[in-house]
Amino acid sequence: MASLALSWSSTATGLPSQPLFSIKPPHSSTYTTRTRRCTWSCKANNGGQNEKHSPQNVETSQGKLDRRNLLLGMGGLYGAAANLVSDRSPALATPITSPDLSKCSTGTNLNTQQPLDVNCCPPVSKEIIDYKLPPVGKMRFRPAAHLAGEDYYAKFEKAVELMKALPPEDPRNFMQQANVHCAYCNLTYQQTGDPKLKLQIHNCWHFFPWHRWYLYFFERILGKLIDDPTFGLPFWNWDNPDGMIMPEVFARKHSPLFDARRNTSHLPPALADLAYSSKSPTNPKKIIPNNLTVMYGEMVRNVSKLEDFYGAKYVVGTAPDPGPGSVERGSHMALHGWVGENTPTGEDMGNFYSTARDPIFYSHHTNVDRLWTVWRGLRGPKPKDFPDSDWLDADFLFYDENAQLVRVKVVDTLDNEKMGYVYQDVDLPWLKNRPLARVKKSKAASSSGAPAAETVFPVKLNKVVKVLVKRPKKSRSKKDKEKEEELLVIEGIEVDTAKFVKFDVFVNDEDDKPDELDKAEYAGCYSQVPHKNSTKVKTKIRLG
């Protein structure tokens, strides 16, 4: 059962229009359902990156309604809203710094109050070296997985086989490498500087840089094991119809790239579903256009501001999961759930503690990393990185290819070529795939009969819910649009981290077909794969 509560404040003026927002019933699923509480807080800003909600401009009363229209649901959520973002990080911020590995814990299952049955803590080393990127000689080349040949895969398989054969206590061993993700992503570390809070690198602005470092060292370990300093990981090119099928080599049962804990219905020749849920379509004629619409939204439509793409600010004193970026909450999460077993906990790929045990994790995330590089290229003269030292100076710990514990910083991840690797050039079929509106907005709103949002929320999402929320201003000029972007921010999404969560968001839709995403009315989604550590978190998403 899902529940939502809304809260608004507004500083904008003008005659409102009334877009329609409707909430559709939850998808039936083998995943356990959960309760979620969402607070919608919206405020127009002036295009700045550091907009904050001060006590005087955040209204927590259920009765105060910001001037915008909204439609929300477990199976579909519709919204049109003015721009605004909440920044709940401490006023005097300190960047996230390396955890104390000696204080790694196995964590506690908050449902049972019993210790977790998985220990993903790494070996502890007394010596930590500040890592410096080595001079780049010949670039490592990362090929598209569906285009790589048998000679390449023979080399890749040999490297993974050797990694799995390393002594269990060696930090370069395959399971030790998998546990790196488990430890950083399942609340086993304390925040250095605020031991009351746990460290989590997902659902925040560290998602891309942390995973880039993770892949960087994993790749270098493989290269050293086969004595090939130019070896590069393959990327699963799931954003292109030609690469949407799981690369066949990963499905060979006797390959070191195989993992038994996968959804057997999604092995080749099934097409990857970038908006995966239990009600997802199986017809390729629907999956492919849906996927291209998802990618356009994540890479073009919903990423005008840096936070939209990277995720929310996360510093010492910030509670975990302040908010994911567009790719992280969308296609990235969808593929984790799509590959993992069809069980409530979704191992291996579909659960954060076990996901990196599946070798396809690394090809999946190599494509995510590639999309970061692509997005930066699409930005042109626009800012590509936060100038904030709280982001640039954040640091993490990894073991390198020599089993040396090293400290690395976000600032060194901003150029993949300086890190010594490049990607194979492939087409971007989603780039020109801007979806068209199916209905006139005025028609959708006027014919809906939906009540005002303040009369409906809070609500349990066990049925279709449609509400109208007034926008702050209509008929904005081009100059107005350049000055203020219109966004829907859903914040205060409260979830249990141990369970699968997904809802879609639509604006002014009228046909109640949540499996049809190739239309402008589809605004995006929120998605979460389970964690081993069960806890309640609050997060947010931003939709354009």
Model-inferred region functions:
Residues A2-G544:
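C-terminal accessory segments of proteins
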